[in-house]
A protein has these predicted regions:
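Glycine-rich phosphate/pyrophosphate-binding loop regions near the starts of catalytic domains
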Residues: 1-101
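Glycine-/charge-enriched secondary-structure boundary and capping motifs
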Residues: 18-36, 41, 45-58, 108, ...
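A glycine- and small/hydrophobic-rich beta-loop-beta segment
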Residues: 87-90, 95-123
Length: 196
């Protein structure tokens, strides 16, 4: 994969705090690139986002691009009823809340292998809204519902776990041996989401 960046920051003027925002954002982006071994192919410079006294919110957006055969691409939409669904947490450093980069890369490599072997029906990255939002979006694509397990940790459903993964498994969870995961539920044939 290659990254591209689009950045919007207020006019910097002579205020050191304003200069610190793009510096911190770009240093963080550079750290992620370096640790994951993923280069950036450039981006569009949109630094001046000010008009009179109005400033844009400081923003750095990254898009990841890659090439593959169409036959190897997947979807985030659940494919069939009766599938087990697993949550794979992104390994993070508890002190800094940053990914543990080496382990994160190993997790992504392992999931890529599972996708290639055809044992993953659907995969989604957890973003804003947490695991619950990821599961809901996976339901919408093919109108396949979802029943959360009774013992699911409800505190994690809306927790900020960005970068974690939700996988619909083709045939059980034996394929996840050696990977940290939690079975969170099962797909169902009714277009509804059940949390008892």
């Amino acid at each position: 994969a290659r990254l591209t960046f689009q950045e919007y920051f207020e006019r910097l003027r002579e205020d050191p705090r304003r200069w610190g925002k793009p510096a911190a954002a770009l240093l963080g982006a550079f750290l992620a690139q370096k640790e994951m071994g993923v280069p950036s192919i450039g981006g569009k410079d949109s630094m001046s986002g000010s008009f009179n006294d109005l400033d844009v919110p400081p923003t750095l957006v990254s898009f990841a691009l890659s090439m593959t055969k169409a036959s190897r691409t997947g979807s985030a939409a659940f494919r069939k009823a009766g599938s087990l669904v697993a949550f794979l947490p992104l390994p993070v450093d508890e002190k800094t809340r940053l990914p543990r980069w080496k382990e994160a890369g190993e997790l992504l490599d392992e999931v890529a292998k599972l996708v290639r072997f055809g044992v993953v029906n659907a995969a989604s990255v957890v973003g804003e809204g947490g695991v619950a939002a990821a599961v809901a979006k996976m339901c919408f694509g093919n109108r396949i519902g979802f029943a959360f397990n009774h013992d699911v940790d409800r505190r994690t459903l809306f927790a900020p776990l960005a970068g974690s993964l939700v996988l619909e498994l083709r045939e059980g969870d034996m394929c996840l041996e050696g990977v940290e995961y939690t079975l969170i539920g099962t797909t169902i044939d009714r277009p509804e989401i059940v949390l008892d």
